[in-house]
């Protein structure tokens, strides 16, 4: 009996091909580190790239050639939305010319479209500074909203890559189970923070404060997007001298000079909080990001 060696080879290779295609291999471009981390949790075998780190201001990004190349390869683009990336994402999309990620009915996903945002504005003008009419975009620091976003992102992945739907469903189930188990623990840790007052830079931690019950009584920015001025810092010092402020808070990517000036003169601790995954050594994923934020806030004496 003659054995066709080519046929044997083809039969031998078939299981390998099947194994290769059975893994979800979406190319994911995340605008921020938190959404790269979420995408990794929901699609562990996907190829994921983050355009920014927790040490960068996601409002201000240059449409560099490396970013254009990455977006050109993307099957899915995951961003905060609510116009956080309005200064650079449209330019990047135009230069990349990738039809797969041009619109939200295809491979473009905005987290802010999946949940209610805080602080929506009916109208906006330039005198108001760098504000977002669609609401505050920094919504990854609310655990309930993040769970809703995870469910919607998983559904988007299944729509784009239906042959691997079982992997996405299993990953979402694993993430949701772990996340829902942590929420009551985080709520317990946050109990002592309710009613505490802080002065913070920008509205970066609006959702975290809203969830924990912390009150931001003043902003280091005179207007959103403007650096602290000496006259504004002087007015903040007057506010801080009322004696009810727990700390001055800045995010990992923000300039802390104004905060340090105020902290020294008002005798207040200055707390640098991780804005996202990678914002400090402890924040290696979304779970440890929340753990670190609560530990730092509870550590203020």
Regions found by a protein language model. Give the residues of each.
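N-terminal secretory signal peptides that target proteins for export/translocation
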Residues: 1-4
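Bacterial N-terminal signal peptides
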Residues: 8-19
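Extracytoplasmic metal-acquisition and chelation regions
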Residues: 24-301
């Amino acid at each position: 009996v003659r054995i066709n060696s080519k046929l044997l080879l083809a039969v031998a290779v078939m299981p390998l091909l099947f194994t290769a295609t059975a893994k979800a291999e979406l190319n994911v471009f995340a605008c921020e580190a938190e959404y790269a981390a979420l995408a990794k949790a929901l699609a562990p075998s996907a190829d994921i790239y983050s355009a920014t780190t927790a040490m960068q201001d996601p409002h201000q990004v240059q449409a560099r050639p490396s970013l254009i190349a990455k977006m050109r390869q993307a099957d899915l683009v995951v961003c905060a939305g609510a116009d956080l990336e309005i200064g650079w994402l449209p330019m990047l999309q135009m230069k990349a010319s990738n039809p797969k990620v041009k619109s939200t009915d295809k491979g473009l996903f905005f987290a802010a479209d999946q949940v209610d945002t805080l602080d929506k504005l009916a109208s906006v003008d330039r005198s108001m500074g760098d504000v977002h009419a669609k609401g505050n975009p920094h919504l990854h620091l609310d655990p309930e909203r993040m769970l809703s976003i995870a469910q919607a992102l998983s559904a988007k992945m299944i729509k784009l890559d239906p042959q691997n739907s079982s992997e996405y469903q299993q990953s979402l189930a694993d993430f949701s189970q772990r996340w829902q188990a942590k929420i009551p623990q985080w709520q317990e840790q946050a109990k002592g923070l309710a009613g505490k007052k802080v002065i913070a830079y920008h509205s970066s931690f609006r959702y975290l404060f809203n969830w924990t019950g912390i009150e931001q009584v003043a902003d280091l920015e005179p207007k959103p997007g403007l650096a602290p001025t000496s006259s504004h810092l002087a007015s903040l010092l007057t506010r801080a001298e009322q004696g009810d402020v727990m700390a001055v808070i800045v995010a990992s990517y923000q300039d802390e000079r104004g905060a340090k000036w105020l902290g020294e003169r008002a005798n207040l601790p200055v707390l640098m909080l991780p804005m996202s995954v990678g914002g400090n050594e402890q924040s290696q994923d979304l779970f440890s990001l929340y753990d670190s934020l609560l530990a730092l806030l509870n550590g203020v004496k």
